[in-house]
Amino acid sequence: SLWVWIFAFFLYDFCYYWMHRLHHEVKVLWATHVVHHHGEEFNLSTALRQTSTGFLWKWIFYLPIFIVGIPPEVFVTVAGINLVYQFWVHTEHIPKLGWYEYVFVSPSNHRIHHAQNKHYVDANYGGVFIFWDRLFGTYKEELDELKPIYGTAKPLRSWNPFKANLDIFAEMIKDSTRTKSIKNKIKVWFSRPNWRPDDVKVSHPIYKNDLDNFEPYNPSTSFEVKIYSWIQLFFIMGLSAAVTASVTSQSFQDTSIFAITLLITSTIALMSMEKYELSFLPEILRSSAVILSLIHI
């Protein structure tokens, strides 16, 4: 019935709020979400910046939806609507929307969610409805006198997708290994994201952004590397379109080969943009992957 759909829509967003909030408050969860916040620009592409490890924990938070008997097709539909809604709020070009800000997630209150300013952090977790944040005390309003600075307090300073997805996991492993306290070896994983053992903070300090002198990550790149990267981008777009168009007729092995080729190509192209010149060995690896995929076709 219509009431089932309405109930499911609200329940999904309620579960999303708590899933999202805890992914900002528990480090092992934050490790699977941080990729979405690494971006130091705020635009629609930020919405597409998604982690590869989110599947590890997120499903747990939606179990109540199935426990109360919501049909799978209803769950998938409301989840899709919720996800699509979140796309448009990743923009700086839409100002505050008056009464809308009191009920729904908007570009203004979502800009705060992505800001690393001390006044703004840990706020506005809703997916569609912002009243969850107002109800549970996590709402913060965008101030005219304080422009949001986007990104994470501990900057990634890289376009390497492997580093982005594994950076916090690596930090937790190192900190839990280095600290002398048995208690802290466990606490590292379940603490707040900014917490580190005192002995490790002293022996292995981590650089944090100076927001008074903040500059987004934008390494200088030679003209040749830019041309190379554009060529790789067009190749990636073409192969992605071809794979998508024929995915129903592909075997799992075929799809896996194409996916690995795209992953290697895009990663090497991104890493090349961080240097003035191409690296010989990665380019050999990329070319080999392309040749093998073409032979397989």
Residue ranges and their predicted role:
Residues 2-161:
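Membrane-embedded catalytic scaffold of the fatty acid hydroxylase/desaturase
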Residues 21-30, 189-210:
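Short, charged cytosolic
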Residues 42-54, 210-229:
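Membrane interfacial helix-start motif at the N-side
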Residues 147-195:
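A membrane-cytosol interface segment of integral membrane proteins
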Residues 241-248:
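Juxtamembrane "helix-exit" motif on the non-cytosolic side of transmembrane helices
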Residues 250-261:
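Structural signature of hydrophobic alpha-helical transmembrane segments
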Residues 280-287:
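Cytoplasmic-side transmembrane-helix entry/capping segments in multi-pass membrane proteins
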Residues 295-297:
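Conserved small/polar residues in nucleotide/adenosyl-binding loops
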